[in-house]
Amino acid sequence: MGIKYSNKINKIRTFALSLVFIGLLIAYLGVFFRENIIIMTTFMMLGFLAVLASTFVYFWIGMLSTKTVQIVCPSCNKPTKMLGRVDVCMHCNQPLTLDSNLEGKEFDEKYNKKTIKHTNIYK
């Protein structure tokens, strides 16, 4: 079985959600240090900053999501948003591309990196 790919927008949203829970956990750890006000306040502030960072990530991905290309997946016929040259469907994980040079090739997220040099086989 190959690597399980996920939609880029969903990956970023999952990261933001994990920041919320990590921030709450860090802030909750501060409760165990009630005797030392400095340590308790430090944990509470770090937790608050993690939750605040998740807010910024959610805002950023929301703004980015409005600028993405919206296409209809050929497999499930549901609308999905696509970031980059290659992505997968949000609903059925079907590999998608808008680049005609990549059609028929094996799906690889490395195609989205700018450092990849593509060789021209028609020379």
From Swiss-Prot:
<keyword id="KW-1003">Cell membrane</keyword>
<protein>
    <recommendedName>
        <fullName>UPF0295 protein Bcer98_0460</fullName>
    </recommendedName>
</protein>
<keyword id="KW-0472">Membrane</keyword>
<dbReference type="InterPro" id="IPR020912">
    <property type="entry name" value="UPF0295"/>
</dbReference>
<dbReference type="GO" id="GO:0005886">
    <property type="term" value="C:plasma membrane"/>
</dbReference>
<keyword id="KW-1133">Transmembrane helix</keyword>
<keyword id="KW-0812">Transmembrane</keyword>
<dbReference type="Pfam" id="PF11023">
    <property type="entry name" value="DUF2614"/>
</dbReference>
<comment type="similarity">
    <text>Belongs to the UPF0295 family.</text>
</comment>
<feature type="transmembrane region" description="Helical">
    <location>
        <begin position="12"/>
        <end position="32"/>
    </location>
</feature>
<feature type="transmembrane region" description="Helical">
    <location>
        <begin position="43"/>
        <end position="63"/>
    </location>
</feature>
